[in-house]
C-alpha cells in the first residue's frame, strides 16, 4: 500500500523543533509556550501554531514579532507569534480570560531557560 507523502505545509514535530531552535538562538527567551488548538490536541490540518515567546524585556512588541517572524521564514510553518516581557506575563498569567492565563494553564512549554 502506498503511503501518502506529508504535505510541505504540514506541521511536523521536526518543524516545530526547528522553529523553537531558531527562536531561542535569536531571542534568548525565558520561555516558549505552545498554546491554542495544537497544545489542546484539537487542531485541524489547517490550524496554525500559536507560540508565546516570553522574553526578559520587550521594548517594542510589534518590531520583535516582525524580527522573529523573519527568522522563521522558509520553514513553511503557519505560526502566530505572541511576544511579551517576563514581568507583564507574570502580571497577567493568573487573570482568567487572558491569552496568558490560557497559555499558562493549557500550554506546552517547548523551551525554558535555566
Locations of regions flagged by a protein language model:
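Glycine-rich beta-strand-to-loop/alpha-helix junction loops that act as flexible
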Residues: 35-37
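Catalytic core of pol beta-like nucleotidyltransferases
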Residues: 1-31, 40-45, 55-114
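Short beta-strand->loop micro-motif that forms the acidic, two-metal-ion catalytic signature
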Residues: 50-54
Amino acid at each position: 500500500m502506498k503511503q501518502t507523502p506529508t504535505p510541505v505545509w504540514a506541521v511536523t514535530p521536526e518543524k516545530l523543533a526547528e522553529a523553537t531552535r531558531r527562536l531561542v538562538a535569536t531571542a534568548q527567551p525565558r520561555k516558549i509556550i505552545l498554546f491554542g488548538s495544537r497544545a489542546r490536541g484539537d487542531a485541524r490540518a489547517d490550524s496554525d501554531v500559536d507560540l508565546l515567546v516570553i522574553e526578559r524585556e520587550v521594548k517594542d512588541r510589534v518590531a520583535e514579532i516582525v524580527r522573529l517572524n523573519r527568522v522563521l521564514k522558509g520553514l513553511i510553518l503557519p505560526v502566530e507569534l505572541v511576544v511579551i516581557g517576563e514581568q507583564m506575563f507574570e502580571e497577567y498569567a493568573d487573570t482568567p480570560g487572558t491569552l496568558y492565563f490560557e497559555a499558562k494553564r493549557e500550554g506546552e512549554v517547548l523551551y525554558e531557560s535555566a
